């Protein structure tokens, strides 16, 4: 007896094409008022497309989250709340969020489209950056992170792929850096490194020890991740490289980071101490903010020990300082008291 023919395949859906489908499955589709034009990025939780806003006729970056996330009610509520918070942050180094919502079972975020490469591509193309450029880029990222922390948002996934590098304005500002991937519920469904749908939030090369152990996290976990990124910009590789994921997680929790000056001769030795503090296993032993970390890095690059200030510039035309300075000149007549004292 001949078996019956198999049933026809189900019609294609957004769920089938989002996490693992072909790159072009959604190209040309309209989603929530946006015309999808091209895929520009893909991760474990989302896919990012270049799309055209059909209402305002502008190009945006449209991030579509994995469909299973939309089926979690708590996740959807947090997504809505945190997307609104992210959209309210007006900062020159944070990619603006235009809109976030849900359509046809998909959660989406529409953001400014930034022309340029991310830091991952930049490092792969050019190799390690010079110390001045690393400090300059790190400072812009640190400014964005601290602004987010002021709004009670912890990024949790700071990595070169989330740092966009656009053209700057002049030779003193050769690049303008944007931090992206806010508003993706990085605060998640708990205060630990895992979402309640069982997905780890973070990238293993840059993840802080407290994220691995499932402890509560705050902005200092972003200090750790930013330090991993800075070390990679200086040496060409993140602090820890291991053959398998478990060994890498162990290294973040227990192994001391390698001094960058040993990997790249010519770096000031003071840079080692700054990065060692930013990469401390305990958050209490790190810098309190990202900007304090970069300020210490800048001082180390300038040959100033931590805790000191840069020397004050003195105008040579003002003359030299004397141990017995001359008395100040008499005030003009109009500034003298009307009724002189006895």
Describe the role of every protein-language-model region.
Residues 22, 71-74, 166-216, 243:
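Activation segment of protein kinases
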Residues 66-88:
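AlphaC helix of the eukaryotic protein kinase fold
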Residues 104-118, 122:
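Conserved short submotifs of the Hanks-type protein kinase catalytic core
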Residues 100:
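Activation-segment/catalytic-loop signature of the eukaryotic protein kinase fold
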Residues 36-43, 48:
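Protein kinase glycine-rich loop
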Residues 52, 155, 205-307:
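C-terminal lobe helix-coil module of Hanks-type protein kinase domains
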Residues 137-138:
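Activation segment signature within eukaryotic-like protein kinase domains
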Residues 141-153:
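Protein kinase catalytic-loop region centered on the HRD/HxD motif
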């Amino acid at each position: 007896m001949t078996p019956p023919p198999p049933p026809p395949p189900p019609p294609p859906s957004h769920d089938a094409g989002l996490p693992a489908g072909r790159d072009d499955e959604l190209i040309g589709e309209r989603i929530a008022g946006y015309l999808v034009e091209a895929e520009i990025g893909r991760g474990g939780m989302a896919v990012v497309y270049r799309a055209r806003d059909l209402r305002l006729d502008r190009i945006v970056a449209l991030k579509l989250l994995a469909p299973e996330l939309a089926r979690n009610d708590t996740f959807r509520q947090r997504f809505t709340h945190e997307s609104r918070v992210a959209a309210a942050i007006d900062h020159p180094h944070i990619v603006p969020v235009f809109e976030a919502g849900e359509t046809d079972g998909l959660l989406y975020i529409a953001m400014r489209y930034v022309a340029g490469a991310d830091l991952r591509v930049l490092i792969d193309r050019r190799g390690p950056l010079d110390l001045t450029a690393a400090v300059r880029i790190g400072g812009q990222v640190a400014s964005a992170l601290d602004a987010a922390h002021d709004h009670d948002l912890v990024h949790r996934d700071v990595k070169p792929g989330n740092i966009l590098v656009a053209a700057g304005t002049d030779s003193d500002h050769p690049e303008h850096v944007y931090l992206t991937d806010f508003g993706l519920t990085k605060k998640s469904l708990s205060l630990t490194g895992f979402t309640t749908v069982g997905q780890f939030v973070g990238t293993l090369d840059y993840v802080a020890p407290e994220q691995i152990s499932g402890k509560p996290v705050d902005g200092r976990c972003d200090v750790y991740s930013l330090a991993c990124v800075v070390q990679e910009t200086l040496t060409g590789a993140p602090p820890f490289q291991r053959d398998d994921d478990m060994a890498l997680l162990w290294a973040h929790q227990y192994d001391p980071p390698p001094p960058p000056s040993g990997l790249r001769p010519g770096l000031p030795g003071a840079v080692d101490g700054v990065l060692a503090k930013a990469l401390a296993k305990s958050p209490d032993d790190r810098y309190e903010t990202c900007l304090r970390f970069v300020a210490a890095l800048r001082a180390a690059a300038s040959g100033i020990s931590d805790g000191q200030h840069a020397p004050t510039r003195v105008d040579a035309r003002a003359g030299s300082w004397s141990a017995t300075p001359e008395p100040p000149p008499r005030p003009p007549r109009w500034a003298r008291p009307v009724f002189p004292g006895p």
